[in-house]
Amino acid sequence: MEKKLTYYISGYKVELISDFPERLEKMLYGFSPFVVQPKTDNQSPALSPLIMQFVINESQNPSNINFPKTEGEMVHTFAIEEGECSMRKSGNKYNFTILQNGDGRLPLVLDMEIGSSLVNCTCGPANLLNPDNLKFALWIAFGFVAIPRQTVALHSSVIIYNNRAILFLGESGTGKSTHTKLWLEHISGSRLLNDDSPVVKIEFDEANQLVPFVYGSPWSGKGRCHINERYPVASFVRLQQYPANKITKLSKLEAFGALYPSCPPAFLKDDYFEGQICEIISNIIMTTPIYRLQCLPDNLAAELVKVTVFE
């Protein structure tokens, strides 16, 4: 008998429907803080609308799982740690597949349609399902329904200071986590919201102006910092390793180029979703300062950002 798990992610209601809710709940480490509405800096947002029903169809015979038709347009292929991924589309209908690493190559297939909250997930036996692959599939599905609603996950590490957020951007290995650790060690009152994939959402502030807010999410990489809270964004800072500490406020064109690479690559490969993401970025750079920090991995770099953004 199908049962439902309900979560609240970035102010939206998400339902997971399956025949194995107890097992599913144990697999989804990081999701438990999201069974309630997010804590906010001041007033709670309006009642969370339902944007996704993720229905898991467990197949005891993985060979019976239908793969996407070959005539569908290939959007993107890429590898993750535990599998190989592909996304195809035909009109408004999209199909996302993960082939799990190892013997048997167990598939996980998502069927989605623009404008629909229903996501059908077909997978092999639950006891053989890789939890990391399931979490990644949920991340893809959430992006699919959230991006058209001015909401996107950004590859970044987020510090909260004085009830506002700074998102540190950069390619993997640039030193985002290293820099945020320097904040935690040397700047009193700072704390980490998320260390890999926070969710940025364009919302109206108290002055009725559209501005970015950031939410913690169930997806936080190896740091596993899963905090269900929401804060206004003070700034975005793109990191660059450098033999000295220097911070520069970017022009709107430079700011666009700083934010774009931190958006989900699978969606940037698709014309429709790229357009939606570009609209989100445009709304961000109209109201929010974006900086480039060229820096050493030292506490003076963190202090430089604090003084620039907050003082």
Regions found by a protein language model. Give the residues of each.
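Hydrophobic positions on the alpha1 helix immediately C-terminal to the Walker A/P-loop
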Residues: H179
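A noncatalytic interaction/capping subdomain that flanks phosphate/NTP-handling catalytic cores
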Residues: M1-L167, E171-S172, L182-R191, V199-E311
